[in-house]
Amino acid sequence: KTMERYEAFVEYLARKVGRDPVCLRRPTYAETNELVRYGRCEVALVCVCPFLRGERDFGMQALAVPQIRDAVTTHSVVVAPRSSEATSLLDLRGKRFASADIVSYSGWIVPALWLREQKEDPDGFFGEHILAGSHDRSVQAVLMGHADGAGVLSLVYDQMAAEDPTILERTKTVFKSEAFGVPPVVVHPALDGKLKEQLRAALVGMHKDPEGAKVLAALGIQRFVVPEATLFDSARALAKRWEAR
């Protein structure tokens, strides 16, 4: 269902810039970055950490960011079954933990760094680290009893709960981070300048177009905006602390 919505997003964007739509999905964040780095795709949606790494490694640029509930920031949250005795991330010691990817900023790096700053070793803290492949699959792992906790992007968790309110009855939040910039739509810095501006214009104008507004509504997005240069500063600072280990 999620992929169908993003396919509709890709199809809309492609029509706006006169291109054939091809929706590529890779199993890891690193592989998605490689698509952008080597020009195998024109535009991509990436997690915060892959964006920061792409920015550092080859100048990846944030073209636009989604605005959701009047905000362009989000959080990392760790969710657990409602029936769990856990009330904090520390209570998940020795338990099964799910995240989208090993380089997922909200799914792994933020909670893992918090554990390290509590003098814990995140690599040995959990009994099992499950790489679910996406945030919604991480939440599903908790719902299905395959994981005792999951680190996820709060935007995804909130959207899932909005569509299925029973999720809030079956899960609870045991950790919530400080706010950081929402994952962006990115391009390679060497992408043709005219195409880059066409893509940006299509994104920031989507909410004004009835067809575009329908696509956005299905994704739980109000509109796309051009990000301020400082939007990802807090994430950059946290990533530096993580990489300084």
Which ranges hold each PLM region?
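Short helices/loops that flank or line small-molecule/ion binding pockets
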Residues: A30-A44, D57-F58, L90, S134-L155
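Ligand-binding cleft/hinge of the Venus flytrap
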Residues: E7-R19, G107-L131, Q159-T166, A237-W242
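A ligand-binding cleft/hinge motif common to bilobed small-molecule-binding domains
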Residues: V48-D57, P111-E117, A141-M144, D148-L168
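An extracytoplasmic/periplasmic, membrane-proximal ligand-sensing/linker region
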Residues: K1-A8, F180-V182, V186-R245
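Short beta-strand->loop
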Residues: M60-A71, F125-E128, A161-A179
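Flexible hinge/capping segments at coil-to-helix
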Residues: A80-D101, P122-G124
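Extracytoplasmic small-molecule ligand-binding "clamshell" domains
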Residues: K1-L52
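Short helix-initiation/N-cap motifs at beta->coil->alpha
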Residues: C23-E34, P122-Q140, A179-G181
